[in-house]
């Protein structure tokens, strides 16, 4: 597991380069909020991968963590995640747990899980775009990645986990 931002960034770039992924790096002013950084990058909110770490209780004894990845113009549907995970309770993970599991700080969480304790679930509506955009484990650098390469490398579980599109984000942005 990564222990700092540089590790997460390096791990991501190494993975992409080793597999010949098609991506572009985009430098910008430090910003982690999807609705603010998207215009800086020149992408539509629907192309932004908003990444949210959730805690799901399964019964009384089992706790699982989910990295929910949704379009930037949508809100995560907690009940849909709970149902998909066959959980009994779902909530947002605390920032310290989210950052430990994701290997980067809030606002820079990658739409990849390099941690076996963090299950990656992606809403398929994000994958309708030719490219997806996200902060590259840094507030001052983003990445545009071909969607086909993202699917091949991240190997996400797909599930409809959004409440709606085109609404103001109701959850903290962790893209």
Question: In which residue ranges do the predicted regions lie?
Answer:
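Extended, low-hydrophobicity, polar/charged segments
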Residues: 1-175
């Amino acid at each position: 597991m990564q222990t700092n931002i540089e590790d997460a960034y390096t791990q991501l770039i190494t993975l992409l380069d080793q597999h010949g992924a098609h991506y572009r790096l985009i430098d910008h002013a430090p910003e982690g909020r999807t609705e603010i950084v998207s215009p800086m990058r020149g992408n539509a909110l629907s192309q932004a991968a908003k990444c949210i770490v959730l805690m799901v209780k399964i019964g009384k004894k089992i706790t699982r963590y989910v990295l929910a990845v949704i379009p930037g113009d949508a809100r995560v549907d907690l009940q849909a995640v709970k149902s998909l995970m066959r959980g009994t309770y779902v909530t947002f993970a605390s920032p310290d747990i989210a950052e430990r599991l994701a290997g980067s700080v809030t606002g820079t969480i990658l739409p990849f899980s390099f941690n076996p304790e963090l299950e990656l679930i992606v809403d398929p509506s994000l994958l309708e775009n030719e490219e997806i955009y996200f902060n590259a484990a840094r507030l001052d650098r983003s990445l545009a990645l071909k969607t086909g390469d993202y699917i091949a490398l991240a190997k996400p579980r797909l599930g409809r986990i959004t409440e709606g599109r085109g609404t103001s984000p109701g959850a903290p942005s962790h893209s």
